[in-house]
């Protein structure tokens, strides 16, 4: 294995970390309705916990309203309860076989909590990136010990790993900044 292969293999993992972070912050509430808001909601259905999106369609009715069209009429009650109990500050209302979820405006205090949560997710993601960088450097040093590569190539590989880390940390910082603006927007 070469340094380039080590870097490429781990760059794919770094990209996955960024994608996971994007998915994580997409579920954080802003003032607008988004289907990602209900991604983590689990419904007690057919004897097991299932994601809400597996028991019905979730759509955006308008800027402040989500609509959940439940496929099985018997699941309306449990789905409504799951949304209410998800600690998202939402109050769902059942209307026949669908559930209307109004997104109330965020209070200043709640906005600050969501900003803190966004930053926490960002820090967790950065730790994950740093761990991947550490793994890359260990693999590169192992290659040098096995005499597969020379010291110059090892140093170049470490430099590439650092540059890659900084590139992805910068992306996370930009995503955090963008999400904070979105949350604080009234």
UniProtKB/Swiss-Prot annotation:
What domain of life is recorded for the organism?
A: Bacteria
Query: Which keywords label this protein?
Result: Cytoplasm, Protein biosynthesis
Which SUPFAM superfamilies does the UniProt record give? Ribosome recycling factor, RRF
What compartments host this protein? Cytoplasm
The GO terms this record gives for MF are:
ribosomal large subunit binding
Q: Name one Pfam family in it.
A: RRF
- Which Gene3D superfamilies does the protein's record reference? 3.30.1360.40, Ribosome-recycling factor
Q: Which InterPro entries match?
A: Ribosome_recyc_fac (IPR002661), Ribosome_recyc_fac_dom (IPR023584), RRF_sf (IPR036191)
Q: Name one GO cellular component term.
A: cytoplasm
A biological process from GO: translational termination
So what does this one do? Responsible for the release of ribosomes from messenger RNA at the termination of protein biosynthesis. May increase the efficiency of translation by recycling ribosomes from one round of translation to another.
- Protein family membership: Belongs to the RRF family.
HAMAP family the record matches: RRF
Name assigned to this protein:
Ribosome-recycling factor
Q: Which organism is it from?
A: Chlorobium phaeovibrioides (strain DSM 265 / 1930)
This protein's gene is called frr
């Amino acid at each position: 294995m070469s340094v380039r292969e080590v870097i490429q293999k781990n760059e794919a993992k770094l990209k996955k970390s960024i994608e996971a972070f994007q998915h994580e912050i997409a579920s954080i509430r802003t003032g607008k309705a988004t289907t990602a808001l209900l991604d983590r909601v689990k419904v007690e259905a057919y004897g097991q916990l299932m994601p809400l999106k597996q028991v019905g369609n979730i759509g955006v009715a308008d800027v402040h309203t989500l609509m959940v069209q439940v496929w099985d009429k018997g699941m309306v009650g449990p789905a409504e309860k799951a949304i209410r109990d998800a600690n998202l500050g939402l109050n769902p209302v059942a209307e026949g076989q669908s559930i209307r979820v109004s997104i109330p405006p965020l209070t200043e205090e709640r906005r600050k909590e969501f900003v803190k949560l966004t930053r926490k997710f960002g820090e967790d993601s950065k730790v994950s990136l740093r761990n991947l960088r550490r793994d890359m450097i260990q693999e590169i040093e192992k290659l040098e010990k096995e005499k597969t590569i020379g010291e110059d190539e090892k140093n170049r590989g470490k430099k590439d790993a650092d540059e890659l880390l900084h590139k992805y940390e910068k992306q996370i910082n930009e995503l955090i900044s963008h999400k904070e603006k979105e949350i604080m927007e009234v």
